[in-house]
Swiss-Prot record:
<dbReference type="InterPro" id="IPR032387">
    <property type="entry name" value="ACAS_N"/>
</dbReference>
<dbReference type="GO" id="GO:0019427">
    <property type="term" value="P:acetyl-CoA biosynthetic process from acetate"/>
</dbReference>
<dbReference type="Pfam" id="PF00501">
    <property type="entry name" value="AMP-binding"/>
</dbReference>
<feature type="binding site">
    <location>
        <position position="333"/>
    </location>
    <ligand>
        <name>CoA</name>
    </ligand>
</feature>
<feature type="binding site">
    <location>
        <position position="535"/>
    </location>
    <ligand>
        <name>Mg(2+)</name>
    </ligand>
</feature>
<comment type="similarity">
    <text>Belongs to the ATP-dependent AMP-binding enzyme family.</text>
</comment>
<dbReference type="GO" id="GO:0005829">
    <property type="term" value="C:cytosol"/>
</dbReference>
<comment type="function">
    <text>Catalyzes the conversion of acetate into acetyl-CoA (AcCoA), an essential intermediate at the junction of anabolic and catabolic pathways. AcsA undergoes a two-step reaction. In the first half reaction, AcsA combines acetate with ATP to form acetyl-adenylate (AcAMP) intermediate. In the second half reaction, it can then transfer the acetyl group from AcAMP to the sulfhydryl group of CoA, forming the product AcCoA.</text>
</comment>
<dbReference type="GO" id="GO:0016208">
    <property type="term" value="F:AMP binding"/>
</dbReference>
<feature type="binding site">
    <location>
        <position position="521"/>
    </location>
    <ligand>
        <name>CoA</name>
    </ligand>
</feature>
<keyword id="KW-0007">Acetylation</keyword>
<dbReference type="GO" id="GO:0003987">
    <property type="term" value="F:acetate-CoA ligase activity"/>
</dbReference>
<keyword id="KW-0460">Magnesium</keyword>
<dbReference type="InterPro" id="IPR020845">
    <property type="entry name" value="AMP-binding_CS"/>
</dbReference>
<dbReference type="InterPro" id="IPR025110">
    <property type="entry name" value="AMP-bd_C"/>
</dbReference>
<dbReference type="InterPro" id="IPR011904">
    <property type="entry name" value="Ac_CoA_lig"/>
</dbReference>
<feature type="modified residue" description="N6-acetyllysine">
    <location>
        <position position="607"/>
    </location>
</feature>
Length: 649
């Protein structure tokens, strides 16, 4: 059966920034002559000292390095704010919608945002923050989070945002890893009508972080929280004393911009480091072309700033392009399942960019929640975070978009800085479930397990053969880990960790992770991190974690747990372990299934056979493959006999 194909609507082909002929021309130039292409497109942002060098990159061990525009200087905050003031200073930069529809929204102009950023930048300087210093941001989805990011960029400090859903332990680990002495937080966050104790979490985390000497706290709910004299500062009071004039720091293109921690296939999360010049070019260019963005349009990316999508497509990309960007504090189903679409109507949103997890959850609630709203303003829809299944794609297209809005299904990663494989709405015929074709300058390829290039329609491991400006530069404090993680599996190639199918039209279909990483609701969780948390429990001897299919989240978390000899596992312990993991990492890591077992399947050399556990987790047990190397086959029999009966599994 052939896949459905949605041709480019005529009005899009005629009016979009890029039609098919232009895509082919630009793409060809970008891969045949990257120097010339990026010399031209690198000028889309303002440089203080223009670059003369464009691309200096190698994925090979002997001369490994990634440098773009390396002799140019710029300031990202100035590109987001100062350069717009003359033309659109009084236009709205951020439209903020609170968690509750009963609370007033906020409209912040470019001029006001510029003043807010300068004041906060001056506050950071008054607290001794220097260029290159790390500032940890643990804030809810409020405009002050964007202000904090831009203030760091303005003075050359490196921000490290920790998602406000992470636990005190996870926060402490990230503060310690980047050696941050200043933390920005809020008394509480609001999410789906519930209060999130952010300041209490910070206080708990800082018991493990003696190096932190300053906490700047925003009052969001007015809750009565502990205030440590000499360390804690009230945000509003301190900012009010500062001048609204702060000169932007001149940054080299390769100076660090931010660290964002992401789960890897081995234990501790890695601090993905992005630098200033290449990232700025990539975030602004992908935002403009992927969303066919024109000044004056209302654009909404429904991601949290705690994830890379929030960095690139809520804050930096849109603001560099002079957009009006919607920032939403709430969740899709509070107070009811029409919340997203009510916000679309309220602000006349033209471009909406959301995650398949949210869409699947809303699809399950029924069409009436969508249809009670107009959504007439929508012209383009986007999807991000994980592959979108064709059923959800069709629902998004037909029900949310009334069969008239193209969908840009974007594939990318924290490591890539912005979209890599994506449709362009005026150029790409759409296939539900396919990320389609590479963005300019991206050279994807499929290889087999031995690293042999595969041609034509085939399945394989997705790699990228050459650098692009938005690429991460290193893992904070561990350059060797960066090289080993991404460039040694297939020598001289960037290994994405994703499996992929390419069809006869050259479209790419992401099939999911092929390393030990689970994609839960569009957020990467390293299985090793969850396993470490489980094994840290005093009653647990051993744990192995795999992904399992999940109707809403895409993948769920399936944990196999072996208890210490004297422990009799029961439902009480199961609940205890679930709470334990939530506390150690955060709610995002909550196991969906915990299966207790007397032992785990191992080879004679003691290695856990994860392949077998994955099959059991996926309930694909008819063919477990070669089990001849199992030290004790009865272990597998026990797992199969005691696998919980799951709904839909």
């Amino acid at each position: 059966m052939g896949e459905a194909v949605y041709p480019v609507p005529a009005e899009w082909a005629q009016n979009a920034l890029v039609d098919e002929a232009r895509y082919q021309d630009m793409y060809r130039q970008s891969v045949d002559d990257p120097e010339g292409f990026w010399a031209e497109h690198g000028k889309r942002i303002d440089w203080i000292r223009p670059f003369t060098k464009v691309k200096n990159t190698s994925f090979h061990e002997a001369d490994f390095g990634i440098r773009w525009f390396e002799d140019g200087t710029l300031n990202l905050a100035a590109n987001c704010l100062d350069r717009h003031l003359a033309e659109r200073g009084d236009e709205i930069a951020i439209l903020w919608e609170p968690d509750s529809p009963d609370e007033a929204h906020r409209e912040i102009t470019y001029r006001q945002l510029h003043a807010d950023v300068c004041r906060f930048a001056n506050l950071l300087k008054a607290k001794g923050v220097q260029k290159g210093e790390r500032v940890t941001i643990y804030l809810p989805m409020v405009p002050e989070a964007a202000v904090a990011m831009l203030a760091c960029a303005r003075i050359g400090a490196i921000h490290s945002i920790v998602f406000a859903g992470f636990s005190p332990d996870a926060l402490a680990g990230r503060i310690t890893d980047c050696d941050s002495r200043i933390v920005l937080t809020s008394d509480e966050g609001l999410r789906g009508g519930r209060k999130v104790p952010l300041k209490a979490n910070v206080d708990e985390a800082l018991k493990q972080c003696p190096g932190v000497d300053t906490v700047i706290m925003l009052r969001r709910t007015g809750a009565d929280v502990d205030f440590v004299e000499g360390r804690d500062i009230d945000w509003a009071t301190a900012v009010a004393e500062q001048s609204a004039d702060c000169q932007p720091e001149e940054m080299n293109a390769e100076d660090p911009l931010f660290i964002l921690y992401t789960s890897g296939s081995t234990g501790k999360p890695k601090g993905v480091l992005h630098t200033t010049g290449g990232y700025s070019v990539w975030a602004s260019m992908t935002h403009q072309y992927v969303f066919d963005y024109r000044p004056g349009q209302i654009y909404w990316c429904a991601a949290d700033i705690g994830w890379v999508t929030g960095h690139s497509y809520v804050v930096y990309g849109p603001l560099m392009n002079g957009a009006t960007t919607v920032m939403f504090e709430g969740v899709p189903n509070f107070p009811d399942a029409s919340r997203f679409w009510q916000v679309v109507d309220k602000f006349k949103v033209e471009i909406f960019y959301g995650a398949p997890t949210a869409l699947r959850a809303l699809m399950r609630e029924g069409d009436e929640w969508v249809k009670k709203t107009s959504r007439a303003s929508l012209r383009l829809l986007g999807s991000v975070g994980e592959p979108i299944n064709p059923e959800a794609w069709e629902w998004y297209h037909k029900v949310v978009g009334d069969s008239r809005c193209p969908i840009v299904d974007t594939w990318w990663q924290t490591e890539t800085g912005g979209a890599m494989i994506t449709p362009l709405p005026g150029a790409t015929a759409l296939k539900p479930g396919s990320a389609s074709r590479p963005f300019f300058g991206v050279k994807p390829a499929l290889v087999d397990n031995d690293g042999t290039f595969l041609e034509g329609a085939t399945d394989g491991c997705l790699v990228v053969t050459d650098s692009w400006p938005g690429q991460m530069r290193t893992v904070w404090g561990d350059h060797e880990r960066f090289f080993q993680t991404y460039f040694t599996t297939f020598k001289g190639l960037y290994f994405t960790g994703d499996g992929c199918r390419r069809d006869e039209d050259g479209y790419y279909w992401i099939t999911g992770r092929i390393d030990d990483v689970i994609n839960v609701s569009g957020h990467r969780m390293g299985t090793a991190e969850i396993e470490s948390a489980l094994v840290a429990h005093p009653k647990v001897a051993e744990a192995a974690v795999v992904g399992m299919p999940h109707d809403i989240k895409g993948q769920g978390i399936y944990a196999f747990v072996t208890c210490n000899a004297e422990i009799e596992p029961d439902d009480l312990l199961r609940k205890e372990l679930i709470q334990w993991v939530r506390h150690e990492i955060g709610p995002i890591a909550t196991p969906d299934v915990i299966q207790f077992a007397p032992g785990l399947p191992k080879t004679r050399s003691g290695k856990i056979m994860r392949r077998i556990l994955r099959k059991i987790g996926e309930n694909d047990v008819s063919n477990l493959g070669d089990t001849s190397t199992l030290a004790d086959p009865s272990v597998v029999d026990n797992l199969l006999a005691n696998r919980p009966q799951l709904a839909g599994a």
